[in-house]
Amino acid sequence: MFWLLIAILIVQRAAEMAVARQNEQKVKKQGAIEFGESHYPYIITMHILFFLSLIAEVLLMNKQPSSWWLGIAAVILSVQIVRYWALCSLGAYWNTKILVVPGVELVKKGPYKWMKHPNYAVVILEILLIPLLYQAYVTMCLFSIFNAVLLSVRIRAEDKALQEYSVK
């Protein structure tokens, strides 16, 4: 079951990166400006290391699924629904990079009606829940900290870019 989860997550991330590349091309044709280029490689690296850490911790420490695995899995699936709701709400404006088309209105539909950064909330929950599924507490704690640091930089950069270039 562990390898199936890893495979699903890797396929999901690869598909998202493909969509992000397509969306990047679309919005750059509309004049999108990229922000946060300096921290972007760290975000990619953190996500790769998250999976490697999870795999290493589960295998090397012989971690087994939590006795709460069914409930945790249900929450993870619910979080995925929110992820795709957020992505679909942004449409071509969704990206893994910070790309802002000057003069375009901020999206205020879907989960963006209630929350400024729902996809980041999803990532926070995933970094907590996925390791929790296999009791990989070291990965959960370390990468929650790494993610918090990176998101603090990322959200500031994104908010500044959106404030300067988007129509409110």
Curated annotation (Swiss-Prot):
Keyword terms, alphabetized: Cell membrane, Membrane, Transmembrane, Transmembrane helix
TM annotation in the entry: 1-21, 41-61, 68-88, 123-143
Pfam families: ICMT (PF04140)
Gene3D superfamilies found in the cross-reference section: 1.20.120.1630
Compartments (UniProt record): Cell membrane
Molecular function, one GO term: protein C-terminal S-isoprenylcysteine carboxyl O-methyltransferase activity
GO cellular component: plasma membrane
Main location: membrane
UniProt topology in membrane: Multi-pass membrane protein
Keyword Cell membrane: yes
Name the record gives this protein: Uncharacterized protein YpbQ
